[in-house]
Amino acid sequence: MSKLNDIRFFQVKPAIYYGIGAIEQVGNHDFKQVCIVTDEGMVKFGLLKMLTDVLDKHNIKYHVFSDVEPDPSTEIVEKGLTHILMEKPDALIALGGGSAIDSAKAIIYYCYNFKKMFFEEDYIKKPYFIAMPTGSVGRQNPVLQERTKSRP
């Protein structure tokens, strides 16, 4: 039987940028170094380069973790956590769909708890989280079409 004091809570408050030119807003932050969590699709289609060009323009160092796969496993999250602990970025940017965003949030969660258990308070700071979703409503389109068929 669980006790009330066994309950734990963690909340991530992401900043989600969207719209034409939203990627440029990353340069408006005072980041020294960021870690980008993404997948190979974002690399292949050039979206990662768009982001790294903005970071380069603002002299923000970055490290890319592009091992995210659909429905990421705990092993993927652990690999991402290793990158965070080694690089100690100011921010974590999730670039991609739900898998990249979920992976980044899980990495931050474990980073925060790992830090509390093993490190002094100032060794690693919880990185700021930015989500840059690239998914479209295209996947929802068949559902929307089906819903509108029954309307008069």
What are these regions (language model features)?
Residues 28, 35-53:
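Glycine-rich phosphate/diphosphate-binding loop of Rossmann-like nucleotide-binding domains
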Residues 46-123:
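N-terminal small/polar loop signature for handling phosphorylated ligands or for N-terminal nucleophile
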Residues 35-36, 91-93, 130:
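Conserved beta-strand elements of the Class I
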Residues 6, 14, 112-152:
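A glycine/threonine-rich phosphate-anchoring loop and its flanking beta-alpha core
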Residues 31-34, 127:
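Nucleotide donor/acceptor-binding cores
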Residues 38-39, 67, 132-134:
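Cofactor-binding loop segments of dinucleotide-utilizing enzymes, especially the Rossmann-like FAD-
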Residues 1-30:
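N-terminal amphipathic/basic leader segments beginning at the initiator methionine
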